[in-house]
A protein has these predicted regions:
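An acidic intrinsically disordered interaction segment
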Residues: 149-167
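Active-site cavity-forming subdomains of large catalytic enzyme subunits
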Residues: 1-151, 170-178
Length: 178
C-alpha cells in the first residue's frame, strides 16, 4: 500500500507498523510505502542548506483539493527516516521520477504511474481504462545447481505465471471483469 506524501493521513499512515503506536491504528502485517514528490524533496534539501528556510508542507485532501494541515517537511522527512531505521518501512517511491522516466508512448496514451510494488522493481502505468497487475515468482538459489541445467525451467516459471493470470482473468467475478 502506498500513500502520497501530501495526503492528510500520512502521519498516521507512517506509524501503522510501529509496535508502540496507537493499537487501533496498528497494522503490523501490512507493508506500506510513501510516494515522495520532487517538490517535497526540494523543500527538504533547501532546509539542509538554510536552517531558516520555510519548510511548510501542505497535506491536501485528495477529494476536495483543500489544504487540511501544514506540517514541517523537515520533521516529516526525519520521521520517515527514523521509522525506516526502527521498522524497515515505509518503502520510498520517488513518484515524479517514475512518471518522468516513463516511455513516451505510454505518456501519449495518458497513462501515469500512481504507485509501485513495494520493492519498486515493478512500476506499471495505469489510467481509468487500464489496470495493471504484477505477478511475481521467486526461485530458491539453494537449488540453483538442480534447476540451472534444466533448459526449460525459466520458460516453465514464466508460463506458470502466465497461467496464474489467465486463470484469474477467466474466473474473475463479473464485477471486476471489463
Amino acid at each position: 500500500t502506498y500513500l502520497d506524501i501530501s495526503h492528510p493521513d500520512v502521519l498516521m499512515f507512517l506509524e501503522m507498523r510501529k509496535p508502540t503506536g496507537d493499537p487501533n491504528m496498528r497494522c503490523l502485517n501490512l507493508h506500506h510505502g510513501i510516494n515522495i514528490t520532487d517538490n517535497f524533496m526540494k523543500i527538504v534539501e533547501r532546509c539542509m542548506t538554510d536552517p531558516n528556510a520555510d519548510d511548510g508542507w501542505n497535506l491536501i485532501d485528495p477529494n476536495s483539493g483543500l489544504i487540511r494541515e501544514t506540517v514541517s517537511a523537515k520533521e516529516l522527512w526525519q520521521k520517515i527516516l527514523e521509522l525506516r531505521m526502527e521498522t524497515g518501512e515505509p518503502y520510498i517511491h520517488y513518484i515524479d521520477t517514475s512518471n518522468r522516466e516513463m516511455k513516451d508512448f505510454q505518456k501519449e496514451k495518458g497513462l501515469k504511474i500512481h504507485q509501485s510494488n513495494l520493492c519498486s522493481e515493478i512500476i506499471l502505468p495505469t489510467n481509468e481504462q487500464r489496470t495493471a497487475v504484477c505477478c511475481l515468482s521467486s526461485v530458491n538459489l539453494e537449488y540453483y545447481d538442480a534447476w540451472s541445467r534444466q533448459p526449460l525451467f525459466l520458460k516453465d516459471v514464466a508460463e506458470m505465471l502466465d497461467n496464474v493470470l489467465t486463470f484469474f482473468i477467466e474466473n474473475a467475478p463479473n464485477e471486476v471483469k471489463r
